[in-house]
Amino acid sequence: MENFKKEKVSFWQRLAALALAAALALGLAACDAAAVVPAPSVSTAQPAGETQSDSFQMHFLDVGQALSVLVECDGQYMLYDGGNVDDGSYVVSYLQGQGIEELQYVFCSHAHEDHVGGLAAVLSYFPANHVYSPVTEASTKCFRDFVKYTQQQGLSVEVPAVGTVWQLGSATVTMLGPVAQYSETNDTSIVLRVDYGSTSFLLTGDMEADAERDLVNSGANLKADVLQVGHHGSSTSTSYVFLNAVLPEMGVISCGVNNKYGHPHEETLSILRDAGADVYRTDLQGAIVIGSDGQNYTVRTEKQASDAQLNPTDPAASGTAQQTYIGNVNSKKFHLPTCPNLPAEKNQILFSSYDEAAAAGYTPCSTCIKE
């Protein structure tokens, strides 16, 4: 397993990189009728996460064109999504391989099979303290099975509110979104921020550009070291404005090998490159385990892949980049990201171009923008 230590890069280094980036334009799987996969015995080799000394680890399981993320801290465990129905046995086996006997929290990010499908198998095997989802009902069999196995534990599927905070050992988990009601299921994805010491992680499910924009404008603290790249790297997610607010050092993409959707899309890889974010991909590297000591983090992967394979986009494509601007919602002035007079984060709104800011009724700051 590849293993190396990642030192945190300064916020301003990442902001300077993304400030010159291009503003890019912004596969749903139908639920299967298959039965819940019985919990198997542990037989497959698992990533050697158990050998890491870090008391915090985040595992991106290799569930193909789907998502499943295990978070562990101080002997407590949280599962965010369970992949497809057919991934259920693998997810159960992986959790067994980590020595897990109980899950503190189980989250279904949203009601699509490639996120909820494997959770029924998980809940049929592991007791959970709380189970969360943005909805309590959906028309698909895989979601009904998820509810059924939750209820068999004497639990109800809970719909959490934005601002809810959970403790997972000494880590803090905060629900940031969705901040509005959406007709598009992907945009209903539960967005979680996980903080451990000074390291931070953002889980976004399949959240797309509209919900991303609303989340940015809500004033939520989105800056994070590690971003779970939304919707498997689709160009419908990871909008320029959103990535400018997160400024991750690392973006993790969970997608299937040679998947029919073409994920991750070139547009997404390009903007991640522009932001200076290292890209990790389950389709090329298998399961990915990030460990943190509260200051820095280590990254371990099942398989090795070169940077050119992980992000094959052309660095020269950034040459036609447009400037990003930060507006002050109170003064109605907009600034360069390097301006010394930036407003407090809660009063910021992001614009991907000068014209966009002007069209919104904002005027340029005379200190940082010379006309």
What are the functions of these language-model segments?
Residues 2-6, 28-321, 341, 347, ...:
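Non-globular, low-confidence helical/coil segments that flank catalytic cores
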